[in-house]
Amino acid sequence: MLKLFSAFRKNKIWDFNGGIHPPEMKTQSNGTPLRQVPLAQRFVIPLKQHIGAEGELCVSVGDKVLRGQPLTRGRGKMLPVHAPTSGTVTAIAPHSTSHPSALAELSVIIDADGEDCWIPRDGWADYRSRSREELIERIHQFGVAGLGGAGFPTGVKLQGGGDKIETLIINAAECEPYITADDRLMQDCAAQVVEGIRILAHILQPREILIGIEDNKPQAISMLRAVLADSHDISLRVIPTKYPSGGAKQLTYILTGKQVPHGGRSSDIGVLMQNVGTAYAVKRAVIDGEPITERVVTLTGEAIARPGNVWARLGTPVRHLLNDAGFCPSADQMVIMGGPLMGFTLPWLDVPVVKITNCLLAPSANELGEPQEEQSCIRCSACADACPADLLPQQLYWFSKGQQHDKATTHNIADCIECGACAWVCPSNIPLVQYFRQEKAEIAAIRQEEKRAAEAKARFEARQARLEREKAARLERHKSAAVQPAAKDKDAIAAALARVKEKQAQATQPIVIKAGERPDNSAIIAAREARKAQARAKQAELQQTNDAATVADPRKTAVEAAIARAKARKLEQQQANAEPEEQIDPRKAAVEAAIARAKARKLEQQQANAEPEEQIDPRKAAVEAAIARAKARKLEQQQANAEPEEQIDPRKAAVEAAIARAKARKLEQQQQANAEPEEQVDPRKAAVEAAIARAKARKLEQQQQANAEPEEQVDPRKAAVAAAIARVQAKKAAQQKVVNED
């Protein structure tokens, strides 16, 4: 009973939700054997024919290449490409490739020489003696990628599987209409396909190996059964024809009943899937030592006279293949690369064949029907019923059209396999797959930008952290340098510390005084007296310095004289502006005048008694003259403001004027007599004295005129004569001094 259950379990087939049954249209091309196509004159080999980054160029323009020679180096996930034939590299430039966008990609352009010479080939017939790593590296360096349509590097896929793969599935379903490349390959090369499957099994060491094939390929099924007749490690599973049973997730569920988790991979559940064409390419790479330079391509459609499957070299222009098959284009002819549901229309026919090219469909105008105009969605939910991934295409359509990327991601748009079943059943002829492709591309671009922004932020934060560390290190170095004293400073610091400790020790010692004795403070008193004497000496020195500076500086003397004159003028103004009721006492004024005369006589006597060698300071004389003028003006104002009844005697004034003139003459004579011959008279002093004499003369004249009583009039003639005499004497004194100076 247990064996019966195991046998039932072994051959059980599961069914997935959704799916459609379109016309197969496979009989147009699967009835004729594989054939070779003549070499083209020029080959265009894009550097990127797989998922991932392009390899590094290892050829240059003008190089001679052989078939199978690497054109790029494959490092990491970068898959190399190889020359499809022998010839010369004529250009390395961007060229439009087999892509829905028809964007230009960097390509190597080779002109064939027609000889089609191979590089030396080193096959590993005894591959079982090789290690797993060696086999994976050989598969990778020979450019083997998934030929079912995805183009994922096979070596990377095998490396990622590791030791956790329990089931190896070979996808031979080929469910899309018109395409028969795998069907024809299994019919003509079944033994080589099985040998490639065994190499994959040797690398992965799975518990079971399953080949899934649809029941609409009877010849291929019979050929595989014939090859597997004596094999018990490989199981051939025939499944019902249903589109898209060839999808990776759908075929995995059909054969194992396991579902690939959302956002995960089939390896997460212990399953790894490879295409029939990939298994054949692995056999040629490992056993025959031939890199992938060609693949099987289906040429079909009513616009082709000789449909079938051909061995097409990679890089062959599509136009060359179609012309070899008898292509008869119509006015609005279109050519589809791939099937009618998952393929795309080529913008022009000079694009090259690449590793993922499995079919070239050239339908007639009536074969696919007239293109229908897109209409509004009627919410019929037919797309949701047909979706094999259990998605909601209607909602995804609205989210994609409205640029609602977050909601589209939430509704698992990434799980869409772009099979086209929803668009096939849509009564409004909405190209849903195109909307979904565009939305996924935009989401991928947004995530790529976010990734770059995150990387830039991480780099910025790392840089900021590095700068902060460097700043902290600099501050620490500066701090250490500031704390550590120089060698010569250490001794001074040590000496200062020693003195402080000594003082502290002395301070802590108790003062002991014996009974009956007085403390000896003589040292303290002597120190205090010394400090006082030093302070007094400094003060005396400072005073001497200031006096010397005062005597030596003529500018300071001139400033002091100017200050004295300013004060005198201010005093005159105050007295002139005094109130009328505040009268100056004439007696007090007379006393002040007598004091001034006494000071003048005293000054004359001092000058007369001065030693001959003593020189009169001209600055001091100028200051004294200014003071005398100020006092004279003050006295004159006081006399003018005196009461009318107290009038000054004009005779007395005349006597005083005469006395003043006599004193002036006497002073001039003394100065001339006491001056040494070599000593020159200061012209400034002479001018000051002359001015004093003139001022006194004018003062006396004014006093006499203002204060004389009406009945006692002074003879004006006499006053004029006296003034003239005074002026003549002043001029004479000035001239005499000038002569003495000369």
From Swiss-Prot:
Domain of life: Bacteria
Signal peptide: none
Chief location bin: membrane
GO cellular component, one term: plasma membrane
Annotated localization: Cell inner membrane
Annotated spans, Disordered: 602-719
Cofactor note: Binds 2 [4Fe-4S] clusters per subunit.
Any one Gene Ontology molecular-function term assigned to this protein's record: 4 iron, 4 sulfur cluster binding
Record's bilayer topology term: Peripheral membrane protein
Residues involved in [4Fe-4S] cluster 2 binding: 387, 416, 419, 422
Cofactor requirements of the protein: [4Fe-4S] cluster
GO biological process terms held by the UniProt record: electron transport chain
EC numbers on record: 7.-.-.-
Keywords associated with the record: 4Fe-4S, Cell inner membrane, Cell membrane, Electron transport, Iron, Iron-sulfur, Membrane, Metal-binding, Repeat, Translocase, Transport
Domain 4Fe-4S ferredoxin-type stretches: 369-397, 407-436
Similarity comment text for this entry: Belongs to the 4Fe4S bacterial-type ferredoxin family. RnfC subfamily.
Quaternary context: The complex is composed of six subunits: RsxA, RsxB, RsxC, RsxD, RsxE and RsxG.
The protein's role, per its UniProt record: Part of a membrane-bound complex that couples electron transfer with translocation of ions across the membrane. Required to maintain the reduced state of SoxR.
PANTHER family (UniProt xref): ION-TRANSLOCATING OXIDOREDUCTASE COMPLEX SUBUNIT C (PTHR43034:SF2)
Protein name: Ion-translocating oxidoreductase complex subunit C
Source organism (scientific name): Escherichia coli O6:H1 (strain CFT073 / ATCC 700928 / UPEC)
Gene of this entry: rsxC
